[in-house]
Amino acid sequence: MIPTFTALLCLGLSLGPRTHMQAGPLPKPTLWAEPGSVISWGNSVTIWCQGTLEAREYRLDKEESPAPWDRQNPLEPKNKARFSIPSMTEDYAGRYRCYYRSPVGWSQPSDPLELVMTGAYSKPTLSALPSPLVTSGKSVTLLCQSRSPMDTFLLIKERAAHPLLHLRSEHGAQQHQAEFPMSPVTSVHGGTYRCFSSHGFSHYLLSHPSDPLELIVSGSLEDPRPSPTRSVSTAAGPEDQPLMPTGSVPHSGLRRHWEVLIGVLVVSILLLSLLLFLLLQHWRQGKHRTLAQRQADFQRPPGAAEPEPKDGGLQRRSSPAADVQGENFCAAVKNTQPEDGVEMDTRQSPHDEDPQAVTYAKVKHSRPRREMASPPSPLSGEFLDTKDRQAEEDRQMDTEAAASEAPQDVTYAQLHSFTLRQKATEPPPSQEGASPAEPSVYATLAIH
């Protein structure tokens, strides 16, 4: 018995503080309308009330109407309720508040929501004095006029945080009107405006909206902080609201824009510098190559032939078309003993004394056999001194060869020389009685 009593006492002590804390005032809900609080006659509107997850019921009250005006169960996840108005009429215009009920009681009332209906009266006219195009820092006045005896006017700026501005009308003229001065004008004042007219005893019923007026602000981007607009010639009601927020003009977007422009400019300059550097390097390399080529051409004597190969033996070069066009070979004749199977018939131009004489050599060859030695031939005629290299660098030989279709190939070689040294050699003493042999020409033949 005693342990049971002790357990119940501890449970009561532990639940006591919690119950005491929850019994306090609940936070007030949030109330708003979609698509907005200013609704044209005949259009639908939805009122939302949002509380906490512990809410069990939501209630909507309308001023000057029996309470509660409507009750709704919460929607999942049970933190808000919806109140629908299918068609807006004069009966729905007014001021609303909402509550929600939790297990511990009802919450505090929400902030008021003013539901305004337009289209109850004829539309007024809206104009700008002196002009809808105003320079930043100057003053401008928006004038709303009505032909009907209206005493309340409202000015609305589209997409503004606080769209409504209530002002009383000015009496003493045939046309009732209200002035909305703006001084000094800044960039935040620019935009599209409309005005409404109504009676003071029911300012939730408005006229049709006026034609839109576009206010254009030109000049410097940095403007002073706008001051709240008030009518000088009218008395403001307690429901007056500022036309625009009175905070400082935000410049974060402009600063970000300048930062982007500066970054793009820096990147462009870097890319241009890199391109100029590459072009300069390419121009310098081309200039060095041109100078090196000119120096090489200057060191080589004009008309000098390519240096002849030092190897004077028989050189054979094979190609894939060798079986069809015959063998291509280079033969250097340096002694008086031609290779086996080669018969050379030389014919010299009649102008032997011409330094640029042309000599044709008919070469009849067969497969050379390197293991057999040919008999020595007599040495006579003119020959080229091969020991003097510097004197023979002026010699150039162009050869043209044509493959013959006969079983034995016949090749003609054209010898074009710039400087020829002719030397006549006397026959050996053992051949004085023999008939003189034809002169021989020793040259390097390159047959392609």
Swiss-Prot record:
Phosphoserine found at: 319
UniProt biased composition (Basic and acidic residues): 344-354, 384-398
Motif (ITIM motif 2): 410-415
Domain Ig-like C2-type, first and last residues per copy: 27-118, 124-218
Ranges per topology, Cytoplasmic: 281-448
Any one biological process term the GO annotation gives: positive regulation of T cell anergy
GO molecular-function term, one example from the UniProt record: protein phosphatase binding
Cellular component GO terms, alphabetical: cell surface; cytoplasmic side of plasma membrane; extracellular exosome; plasma membrane
Known outcome of mutating residue 103 to A: No significant change in APOE-mediated activation of LILRB4
Effect of substituting residue 122 to A: No significant change in APOE-mediated activation of LILRB4
Recorded consequence of changing residue 184 to A: No significant change in APOE-mediated activation of LILRB4
InterPro entries registered for this protein in UniProt: Ig-like_dom (IPR007110), Ig-like_dom_sf (IPR036179), Ig-like_fold (IPR013783), Ig-like_Receptors_ImmuneReg (IPR050412), Immunoglobulin_dom (IPR013151)
Extracellular compartment segments: 22-259
Effect of residue 59 to A: No significant change in APOE-mediated activation of LILRB4
Result after altering residue 30 to A: No significant change in APOE-mediated activation of LILRB4
Effect of residue 147 to A: No significant change in APOE-mediated activation of LILRB4
Effect seen on changing residue 167 to A: No significant change in APOE-mediated activation of LILRB4
Domain notes: Contains 3 copies of a cytoplasmic motif that is referred to as the immunoreceptor tyrosine-based inhibitor motif (ITIM). This motif is involved in modulation of cellular responses. The phosphorylated ITIM motif can bind the SH2 domain of several SH2-containing phosphatases.
Name of protein: Leukocyte immunoglobulin-like receptor subfamily B member 4
Organism from which the protein derives: Homo sapiens
Gene: LILRB4
